[in-house]
A protein has these predicted regions:
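Rhodanese-like catalytic fold shared by cysteine-dependent sulfurtransferases
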Residues: 1-26, 33-65, 74-110
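Short, surface-exposed ligand- or partner-binding patches at beta-edge/loop junctions that are enriched
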Residues: 68-69
Length: 110
């Protein structure tokens, strides 16, 4: 018998993420500066994962939902887990990350 544990954050695809980002939900990009500068989701705030892990509350919005993105969805899952552990209750991890965002043809900023 296996026991499934519920993750404290929601995994969403890039299509769902685009809708949420367009509605004004903040996006935190946890990639490294050189990755971010090569292209990122419009309006995304750069907070490299190591920086976020040192002081997650400092980088989270005071309330409301937040989206995390990286290149593929792994680093952002770590950040999402830490955000939830720090008290955030409406946390989304963008599966497929920036690579998936670009593959869909969604806009980026440099």
């Amino acid at each position: 018998m296996s026991v499934e544990t519920q993750e404290p954050f929601k995994r969403i695809n890039v299509d769902e993420a685009k809708k949420l980002a367009d509605s004004g939900i903040p996006v935190i990009d946890v990639r490294e500066p050189n990755e971010y500068q090569a292209g990122h989701v419009p309006g995304a705030k750069l907070v490299p994962l190591n920086t976020f892990l040192r002081s997650p509350r400092q980088h989270l919005p005071a309330s409301g939902p937040v989206l995390f993105i990286c290149a593929m969805g792994q680093r952002s899952a770590v950040a999402s887990e830490m955000a939830a552990a720090s008290g955030a209750t409406d946390v989304y991890n963008i599966e497929g990350g920036t690579n998936g965002w670009i593959a869909k043809g969604y806009p980026t900023e440099k």
